Amino acid sequence: MTAVCATRTEARAARHAGLRTAVVGVGVRRPLPDGRLVSFGLAGALHEGLDDAEVLDATRVVDSDGRTLWEGEPLGVEGATRATLLAVDRVFDDPAERRVLHQRTGADAADMESGALARSGRLQGCVRAISDTPAATLGPIAEMLGDNGRLSLHGVGRAALRPRETARSLSRVRHALRRLSEVSA
């Protein structure tokens, strides 16, 4: 199995856990590797029931209408929470939007890669760590990522104007990645 990651940083956490990795870009911008796939990386919580850095072993991926794209057994990650992931095409940082998505789909968290992996027909499971919650959003970091999944220079500039908030968000992301590599080992 290959742990498919959006970023090199997520792939480093997966390799630390002893997994073979492939980096496909945010929102899956590169070809998927051959064989069985595991969606591995960060996710944003859609409700307050999930904590920062909580690790999820998802058993279901749904689309924006709540339709199941993939369903399977958990991978058995010790200490992980079973969850449903929502496949999205952009970061949802607004707490009100997150609540609506949770109510409409029943999903616990959202990410931008699991949907494409589910549609490939080769997804075996999803291991994700919560990087942000409705109470502790990504803030400036979310602005750095444009709607197309690419780095936005305008967003980087805005994040630079809010260094404390950016530092807090980055700290939460680092903590989630650390937990992901520890729990998955």
Task: Walk through the language-model features, giving the residues of each.
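Glycine-rich phosphate- or other oxyanion-binding loops that anchor nucleotides, phosphorylated ligands
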Residues: M1-A185
